[in-house]
Amino acid sequence: MDFSTMQVVVGFLKTSMGLQSIRDIVQKAKVDEKDKTLLHIHLCFFHANEMARDLNEGMDVSQIHSSAAIKYRAAIVTRHVKMNVETGGYDRKRMVEYNNETCVNWFSCEFKEEKEESQELPVDEDCVEEIVENFLENCGISDQNDQISTTSNANYAFGQGLYEYATRVSDAIVAVISGSIKKGIDEFLDKVYAAMSQIFAAWMPKIRAAFQWFENIKEVVKNWARTMHEKINCILVGMEDCLYMGAGLVAATCIVTLLEKFMVVTKILPAPCGAATLFLTTAMATISAAYVCTKAVEKSVMLTNVLHFVTTNCQIVLNALFNHDATKKELGANQNEGEAPTGVGQFGISTMLQDVANLMSTWSTNSVTEIGRTFGAISQIKNGILALRDMVYFVFEKLSDLAHKVLGFESQVLADLTILLGENVADWLSECDCMVSYMLEFNSRNREIFDRLSQLIEKGRLIRTGVLRTGHRGSSQVMALVTKALEKLIELHNSVVMSGSNTTRKAPFMVFFTGASGTGKTSVVQRVAINWLQEEQLGTNEIYSRNGQDPFWSGYKRHAVVTYDDFGAVPGTTSNEAEIINVISRNPYATVMAGLAEKGMYFDSRLVLASRNFLAANPESGVHDSEAYERRRHAVIRVSLKPGVPYNADDPCANQTYTLLDSKTPFREIQTFETYAELWSYLYTSFKEHEVQEELYLKSLPILDSDKKEALEGLVGLTVIATSFAPKAVMQYGMEKFPGHHFLVSDGEKCYFWHGDGSVESASVEQMQLSKQDVAQLKQQGLSTAMMYKDLAKAFPTLNSLAVLYAKNIVVKRWVGPDLEPTKTCEDVYMREQIGNLPKWQRAYLYVLSKYLTTQSPRGWFMECLEETKKNLRATYLWEYKQWPLPLKLALGSLIAIMAGGAIWYSLQSLWCMSGDASFVAGAATVFSVSSFAGQSDIPNRDNSERSFRNRKVRARTWQGQSSCFGDSALWIAETCMATLTFSNVRTQVCLAPGRGFFGVNHCLAAIPAGVMVKMDSSIGVTYFVWGKEKLLQFDGNEIALYMTSTLPKTVDSLLGRIHFDVETLPKTFSAVFFSYKYDPMIQQMVPELGSVTCKVHNKAYTLAHGEYRREIPQSLSYEASTVAGDCGSLILAEIEGKFKLVGMHVAFNGREGSASFMPYHASLDQKVGQGDFMLKYQEWAEPKILGPGCRAMGLIDPEHALAASGKTTFVETPEEWHLDYPCDKLPSVLARGDPRLAGTVHADYDPFASGMSKYAKEAGPFDAASLKQVCSGIVEIWEDASADFPMDEVDLDTAINGLENVEFFDALVLGTSEGFPYRLDRGPGDKGKSRYVSGESGSLKITDEGVLSDIAWFEEVSKTQVPDLYCIECVKDERLPIRKVLHEPKSRLFTVLPMSYNIVIRKKFLNFVRFFMKRRDVLTAQVGINPYSREWTRMANKLLSKGNNILCCDYSRFDGFLPKCIMNEIGNMIARLMKTDEVSRTQIKNLMLACTSRYAMCNRVLYRVENGIPSGFPLTVIVNSILNEILVKYAYWHCFEDNPSVQSNFDAHVSMVVYGDDNLISVSDAISSRFDGNFLVSFMEGLGIKVTDGIDKTKVGIEFRRLENCDFLKRSFKMSPDGTWRSPMSKESLWPQLHFVKAKKLEMAEAYINNCNNILRELWLHDVKEAEEFRNKVLRNLRWIGHEQLLNMQQLAVFHSEQMNGVSDFLSTCVTVDSIPLMDPLVPGMLPVKTSEIIPRVFVAAEKHFEGNFNDFFTISITTSRKFEEDKGFVLLFPYGAGRGGLPTTQFMRENVIRKGCSIQKKFRQAYEKGNNILFISQSSVVPSYVFAVMLLHSIGAISRLSSNKALTQAMQTCKRLEYLPKEYEEFF
């Protein structure tokens, strides 16, 4: 028989035992008197069997208990007595056998009947106990040895003992209710204890020996019940017995269950036998029989429902604490092995109330009750407090409905309890009293106090609303209580509202919304404000809408939120922008108020929301420093509409997109939010972070001292304000009766007046004969005025500390009376003396505060109101309570026990989790302590006492009495993974996943409703985000789910290696560590716990149940451990292959075993391959050294694979006389740790490898994908235009090795360089790099090594589908560095050697692309392959000057290290698009390029994993770096002009740029130079994590425009030659170190030195021929061992540079200017002049922006610039611009108005020129238009020849390409 059936039939037995009809039949039976007791027991069993037969025939419970059924069965019993008993057919022996058979069948289905000897039963009814004892003896209990004789007997005995125990408990309950027990609860508990002792008599010696607390069990249960009553603030005064009985019944059930477990653990019982179920059913059956069936038959069905409710309450507690239901189902499953077992999700004790509500919803067909929301909304845990409140409402509403049917009238008690408990009124009132105490203790003007008052008021309003919405309204006294408390709160709120902080405050958080009209900015502002108020639990009346036109802050009452609509649209007296500078500040800001009564208001709102169409400040705002305004906007959000998405009134934000912008110019994009939920998550998280920072700042400030003078000034100021509040009659009375006095304060009955000498006078209201209106006004303002005086005293704490430190005690204890003298309640003599010494004005306000805020009792004002309400209701309650039937009292008691006994149930739960008799006994002694029950259930943490987790001591779980192994590796996993997810008041454990996400238990995460605010608390920090159910990834057959979202912080990359995904590789059985980190409600903090478990891989499916949630789990990990509620999400850590890994997460418990699901794998977590067949041997560290997200040191390489790096430089220092007195600011770099040059300095331990790898710590970003694609697409279009004649296909292996002869940029593979890894391991003595792997003649070399060929094929094949891994060798670069980078701040650079096979594959794939890229540098931005000695340098200079002479020279920090994968992926797409490849080849190209950004780096023996950057040994490094450089600048440009598409899409029209690797020069036209400048680049790049400095002066802050001749490129400058070409001299600082250090590896030092001298000569020749000649002479003069023939002479240098410049042409053959040399000077080819210049004598050209002369000195022709001239001083030339004509007018205009003979313009010019005036042609941005006008007018009047105009206009065309139309349209000038 299963337990549920047993529960029913035992109930039948107890019902039978209580029937009066059976007693009557026994009395009438014709049997001996001594046999009547036995007959009564027999007939009860017989009647119970008849009830069971009715049940089997299909009758329901109500039919079985109906009057008709009872009468029918009574007739059957009567017939049985007549026919069988009285006739002798059933003698004493037969009746005992019948009874025994029934007990055997019911109490144990495994019990086999044993033959018993016949024995005489007692004949006296007083010997019933003896019958029981004999019965127990017959069932196998031996008093001599306290042992169980047989297993079957043990179960039988235990079951029967519990049967009797339950009977006695039930009898005691009935006795209490019936009044037979006069001493009440004590006697009731005494009888329960006696019954327990008698029934468990056989085991009492063991129980008493193990549990000394057993003797005190009565006091323990009383203490528990008393604690529960206090928890609900003693609302049940006079009705406590229902709580004591209900709590006693629930507690007794738990104790029985715990004792059963103890007996199983100690082997007294072989297995659990369902003691709790048996006890509950028999107890309820007894009550039912004794009360329902005898006293209330007509309502038996309803009362049976109530008793069933009581039983279920007890079972709910058992299930929540001990997973009792799971144990029962498991035992049932053992009988039916075909069914899958069930595990229970351990989500928390909060589900108990939900289970109660679910039960009550089945009481009637109308199971959905409207209580503000349907009960169906409660079926899943949702918004914490609201959900619990709704469930309490629902449960009490149902109980009230049933009580109405039972009582016949509506229960006022239950209706009031619905409100008092459902709305938690007592806790609200207690919080109000705490608030008053806090206000007295601290400055009541604080924003925190003000907000807390607002929260309490909002909560009170919600309570009042809840009272009105209930179906059972409750008493008027309860409604009056809520109203009275709410009015007092509002009075308190008003008393502090006219104030604020006049000291340093928290700066409010400002959110600025911008966007086009009609995008819905205002609706977003309103929604953000409402959501913020909801999260902060404030009412909607806390929003203040600021009117920008109002010079006053009319209506401002320190609202929490201030909104500005159309911010600054119409400037007022003070603009919104100017106002914000003071509002968003930490300085106090006094608002300008209209009325005198409102003076003294200070702004201290917490959130400011503004919306406006424009980003920048209004030009008329009066803000001179725009940055001061812009930086006050903490978040700038641009609102835009999603194309094609219509407006939805139900969700106004559904069609909006939000873009986070930088608050400062140029307002670059930072992040885009596609949904409002994502935006709200970001804003609320940012707000919380802002609040934390502001609090830290305020805590750092010192307490300011003050003096008496300031205090008196403040007092006078307050009296002025108080005077303005007081009625005129009061002021008049004070002037007449108390001249020289000021009105101080009033308590509503007396008024106090203060004099400057400190005296205080008083007068009663009756004396002043005030009207009722004046008295009301005094009462209304009294508290407010007193609070202001109190705050004044708090502001001057050093003057009178007593008024500050003891203000609370003085007020609360009423130590000051109305006469302002100490009262009798202040018994301390010293304190009375101190109070008497207080100034009278302080005593006055302290008295008034006590009058308003306290009562005569020691309780607070609000709790005293509750006490008064309880007193008024007590008589009504007691009258009603007497009418209640027993089941209803038990129902209420057990329900409140569930709600109020949380700490007790947690204590019992912790006791259940203990294993072993020793730990169980020790834990029970603590839990059942009479003095305290809370916080005592922890096991002493011995084995791990030295362990800590997040600064908390790790608590051990010793389930099997063994210590837990928890090494540093496992601790690192827990520290990295463990996180707490909090939604509303629910906390659950989750595990951070690689990337941006976390693993969690599905039955927990799936219950979170979409759209709620969720908090993630981990080692990374706290993040708030809005829950999106669509982001929850679920896995078939696995209870662990994965949640991925971009709003979470990114975890460390190394986490992936510590998670074990492969279930098949796990052993069938293995040891593991169970680690949890969850909230302990008893100690009110997070507690880390761990324990050892033995895991088994369980391949049998089971069903996981959690509330209504059901899911079948086919495979899991199981372990014997008594886990508890809240353990779901705990980590299962196991040692796999020598190191700890995460193998699973705990998800369920079935009453005996815990269950965990395996970690699910998802493709988004990782993708991993290796390098060919080679496996690098290394020892991985348990805790990798994290340099940053992009780089971590993983471990040590085994010696057999390690490569030793040489620490010796190849540079040799030359003798001092060879230095020739030239300076040297460079030294050879530091190549290894322990460099002797650093000995004794702070850098003595400098490691160049660790320092060099740090550049890879973090990648740049984030980048906007759409913008990045646009920029890259534009670059590829230029490539495609330039690549028409270039093949782009892949070359064969021979070409990749040998190159192509006579084809530029198709060089052969360099064989002398390193071969890379792992080939470097095979290098023998004398071997040279790659050369040993090839054979053949030069030009026809072939690879002969099969291993290299195999690796080449492997790279080509694998890269088609995946990114191959690389093993790279890091070497310190042996170079000369500035002294500061060697001695002062060592900074050596690393060179990366890649595998030879990989490099060859790269050459095969990209050689044609490289040739194109270098060959077409004439049109491309990148100048890779440029010859600085050739005319290319001039071409490059001209290209830059084509946009003007505003040039930016930038220098990047960590350029090699920050290349992100997203850009490398785009570069791969760009190359693939140019090569026109198919999809497979495109993937192969990208994977090959991404391989170098995700590689293993070998630094000596340390192995690093690098996830970004580009290695220097990559064949395409300089090309990729050049592309990256170009992308970054164009990406910045794109975002700079995103508000101007026409400029944004025309980069080349406004900017000319050249790049070479990380070097760049950016020439910006005048038209955009004010916006796209160095400051913008620095700021924008900083937002991407990139540091950019000035390329010339790296110590300079910011980047300024330079002229070309002041820039450098590739360490070379620009110098103009006389012939108009540009030279590229290298900086001299880079030349002289060649004289100090030489590389003498191949040559002797002298030969190397001479080579260096010749290099210097070549470079000096570019500076100046004379300098080169002087240097040559100095070398020959000082170093006579050098012959003159060894150094290049001037002629040889000239020939060299001529050949470099012109190929075969003579460099000295220069063009001779044919005419008018001065005319040519201003316009150098490629240069856009802006400086005022004289082109021929007396004729000047100038640009408007750069002209600094005096117009009075010239006859001015002003071209399109508005200016007035006198007739003889010039004129303005206005004309319509021609499209694409370089700033010149149309041809028709020029011919008719400029060059036509005799035209007005020409005539005026001729006259001025012939008069000898200085003539000035001035145009706007450059001199080009004025230059062309001047040349044409000079030629038209014959001042210059046609040849001169030809030359001049040709050079103008070279400067401005748009003038190319001139020869065609103006042939006469050419």
From Swiss-Prot:
ATP binds at G515, A516, S517, G518, T519, G520, K521, T522. The chain crosses the membrane at residues 910-930. Residues 963-1165 form the Peptidase C3 domain. GO terms for biological process: DNA-templated transcription; proteolysis; viral RNA genome replication. GO terms for cellular component: host cell endoplasmic reticulum; host cell membrane; host cell perinuclear region of cytoplasm; membrane. Keywords: ATP-binding, Covalent protein-RNA linkage, Helicase, Host cytoplasm, Host endoplasmic reticulum, Host membrane, Hydrolase, Membrane, Nucleotide-binding, Nucleotidyltransferase, Phosphoprotein, Protease, RNA-directed RNA polymerase, Thiol protease, Transferase, Transmembrane, Transmembrane helix, Viral RNA replication. Its EC number is 3.6.4.-, 3.4.22.-, 2.7.7.48. It comes from the Viruses. The record marks Q346, F347, Q936, S937, Q962, S963, Q1171, G1172 as: Cleavage. The active site is at H1003, E1039, C1128. It holds the Pfam family Peptidase_C3. The keyword Ribonucleoprotein does not apply. Residues 486-654 form the SF3 helicase domain. The keyword Aminoacyl-tRNA synthetase does not apply. Residues 1445-1572 form the RdRp catalytic domain. The modification O-(5'-phospho-RNA)-serine is found at S937. One of its GO terms (molecular function) is ATP binding. This is RNA1 polyprotein.
